[in-house]
Design a protein with these regions (language model features):
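N-terminal secretory signal peptides
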Residues: 1-10, 18-29
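Non-catalytic, solvent-exposed segments at the cell envelope interface
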Residues: 15-16, 34-314
Length: 314
């Protein structure tokens, strides 16, 4: 696998800050000058306590095509205890989308966005309301990355080293021009470029959503390790490399608070869970293949995992 040139400049501390705070930190620094010294002093991370995010990867290629979310996670960031707990939500999970009816959860953002003329804020509100309605979790903000944006941030770290548990082959991986291509990732230690990391995280034809969710966790943890072990990147390096990679409706003062708190987070404080024990393959009334869920159990499991009273399964 091809490895990109590693950008180098400041300390490991700022690299870790950029990675943990992720899109929030990038957004904050890209608009750093409007923050006065007083505003920075007022951005006390501990005062925010915990924040719930819906984090997703959205296909923003064309207005004429659905802006579906291929990747969705409900993430709780605890700024007091420096922990992140995230639940992966399969894109094909059948849910109620408030104001739009029942459909796969992947469609929620698109319904809200297109109803307002391709508006990010409306799309973010639609997916947030969908999470609250179905899972009973209030969402404070949505953070969405484009496909290209994800690749950009991986390349900003010079690629990512992962340990792939088994060979992955996909003969029909969807390309940016709406075609298909073959992708292959051998088992073992491999180094992925940004584009390859995106393919690694998105492919699911061989092992479904469970496999894809596992690979996403592998990449996220490996990126964190990369940030800690490298010579480091300045936050400004990442901003320059990733302008436009993310969209968020998180207020700027909270973005700054996240950026300030990020150095206190470590890989040990990051936990993941999946819904694999509470979902099963099914068919919707329109004939679509879906995941149906045991909704007598899912909300309690998700809420319990996020608040730390239930251990994760990933």
């Amino acid at each position: 696998m091809k490895q990109s040139t590693i950008l180098r400049s400041a300390s490991r501390r700022t690299a870790l800050k950029a990675l943990i705070a992720a899109p929030a930190a990038l957004s904050a620094v890209s608009a750093w000058r409007p923050f006065s010294a007083g505003a920075q002093e007022a951005a006390d991370p501990a005062s925010l306590g915990t924040l719930n995010f819906i984090v997703g990867g959205i296909d923003f290629r064309s207005y004429d095509e659905p802006e579906n979310s291929d990747v969705l996670m409900i993430a709780r960031v605890d700024l007091i205890n420096s922990t992140v707990r995230a639940v992966a939500i399969p894109r094909d999970l059948w849910v109620t989308i408030p104001n739009f009816g029942e459909d796969k959860i992947t469609r929620a953002y698109d319904y809200g966005s297109k109803a307002a003329g391709s508006d990010f804020k409306s799309g973010a509100e639609a997916i947030s309301e969908t999470i609250t309605y179905n899972f009973g979790v209030d969402i404070h903000a949505a953070i969405m990355t484009t496909f290209d944006g994800f690749a950009q941030i991986v390349n900003a770290f010079g690629g990512v080293n992962v340990n792939n548990p088994y060979d992955i082959y996909d003969a029909e991986y969807p390309t940016a021009d709406y075609g298909i291509k073959e992708v292959y990732f051998p088992a073992g230690d491999i180094t992925l470029s940004g584009e390859e990391a995106l393919e690694f995280c998105r492919t699911r034809h061989q092992d479904g959503d469970d496999g894809r969710s596992m690979r996403q966790r592998i990449v996220l943890r490996s990126l964190l390790d990369t940030a800690r072990q490298s010579d480091g990147l300045s936050l400004q390096d990442l901003v320059n490399a990733n302008r436009g990679a993310y969209r968020t409706n998180l207020g700027r003062s909270k973005q700054l608070a996240l950026a300030l708190a990020a150095p206190d987070f470590t890989n040990d404080g990051v936990s993941f869970a999946t819904l694999q024990n509470y979902i099963y393959p099914s068919t919707a009334s329109n004939g679509a293949w879906i995941y149906a869920g045991d909704w007598s159990q899912i909300p309690g499991y998700v809420q319990g995992f996020l608040d730390g009273s239930i251990d994760g399964n990933a």
